[in-house]
Amino acid sequence: MMKGGIAGLMKQAQQMQENMKKMQDQLASVEVEGQSGAGMVKVLMTCKYDVRRVTIDDSVMDDKEMLEDLLAAAVNDAVRRVETTTQEKMAGFTSGLNLPPGMKLPF
């Protein structure tokens, strides 16, 4: 009886691993947009943290220091949006796992 329980747990763990891989593959194609300066700088990023596109309004091209700040802020905004989107999409998957508060998936 003990062997059956362990085998069941192993099968469940394998299914969970396969589902996690599928979710990660799906998240790789999800894109979010971070912005700063009321949309003067935009960063399009996948949920795998790959930057796909950076859009910069012509009006900020002459001020290098401001542009650097706006670019950093837009990237940080995109990263926060990736984390939020990932947590939302993983919520259903992780609901039965009893993870400690603040633990983020995928690891």
From Swiss-Prot:
The lineage of its organism: Bacteria, Pseudomonadati, Pseudomonadota, Betaproteobacteria, Rhodocyclales. Gene3D superfamilies: Nucleoid-associated protein YbaB-like domain. This is Nucleoid-associated protein AZOSEA06390. Keywords: Cytoplasm, DNA-binding. It comes from the Bacteria. InterPro entries: YbaB-like_sf (IPR036894), YbaB/EbfC (IPR004401). SUPFAM superfamilies: YbaB-like. It is found in: Cytoplasm, Nucleoid. Belongs to the YbaB/EbfC family. Binds to DNA and alters its conformation. May be involved in regulation of gene expression, nucleoid organization and DNA protection. Its main location: cytoplasm. One of its GO terms (cellular component) is bacterial nucleoid. GO terms for molecular function: DNA binding. Transmembrane segments: none annotated. HAMAP family: DNA_YbaB_EbfC. Homodimer.
